[in-house]
């Protein structure tokens, strides 16, 4: 760990927030028979963020926060175009990344977090491929995101573009948090 916040171990308790937000999503999806929705980047990242905060693992806090932040515009677009807004999603997409940013700024992050962020992204893509149906296209693990489908010749080019964009975003975010 590169630093500690003056409040010390009390900050670990803030890890309860993202875990609570994940639990609310479980409550939302599981009874409706939509448990696969829990595998989305944002939902898994909330759970992992909470655990990372408990452990005060600044690199893991950064990685999950980066995924939550980069997904924010996509979530806003989906809500605006497709509807389906749920109040719990504000907690996931706004409160958790704000908490993560605050902690990253105060704890610091390692220099390898951009590449680790890509590794996490790939792990969540693989989880979606193994645990969910191609029809759901969770984490766009099976097909190009429909609104941009015409911009990419195939899924693999799209996936590489996503990873490149995420890497650049993680580099810029890391520098901004210094």
Task: Name each region found by the language model.
Residues 18-27, 68-79, 119-130:
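Aromatic-anchored segments of alpha-helical transmembrane domains
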Residues 1-17:
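N-terminal membrane topogenic signal
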Residues 114, 134-171:
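Membrane-interface transmembrane-helix boundary segments in multi-pass integral membrane proteins
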Residues 44-54, 94-106, 157-175:
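Hydrophobic cores of alpha-helical transmembrane segments in multi-pass inner/ER membrane proteins
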Residues 52-55, 59, 72-82, 102:
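Membrane-helix exit/interface motif
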Residues 27-35, 78-87, 106-107:
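Membrane-interface helix caps and helix-loop-helix hairpins in membrane proteins
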Residues 82-125:
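A contiguous pocket-lining binding segment that forms or flanks enzyme active sites
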Residues 18-66:
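Long, hydrophobic N-terminal alpha-helical segment
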């Amino acid at each position: 760990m590169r630093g500690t916040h003056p409040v010390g171990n009390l900050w670990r308790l803030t890890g309860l927030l993202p875990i609570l937000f994940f639990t609310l999503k479980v409550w939302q999806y599981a009874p409706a028979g939509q448990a696969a929705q829990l595998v989305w980047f944002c939902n898994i990242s909330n759970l992992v963020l909470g655990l990372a905060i408990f452990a005060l693992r600044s690199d893991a806090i950064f990685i999950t926060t980066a995924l939550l932040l980069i997904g924010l515009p996509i979530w806003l677009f989906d809500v605006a175009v497709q509807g389906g807004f749920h109040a719990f999603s504000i907690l996931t997409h706004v409160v958790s990344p704000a908490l993560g940013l605050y902690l990253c700024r105060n704890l610091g992050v390692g220099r390898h977090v951009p590449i680790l962020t890509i590794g996490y992204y790939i792990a969540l893509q693989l989880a979606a491929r193994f645990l969910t149906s191609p029809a759901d296209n969770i984490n766009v693990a099976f097909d190009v995101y429909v609104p941009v489908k015409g911009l990419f010749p195939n899924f693999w080019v799209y996936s590489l573009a996503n990873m490149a964009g995420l890497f650049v975003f993680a580099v810029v975010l890391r520098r901004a948090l210094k």
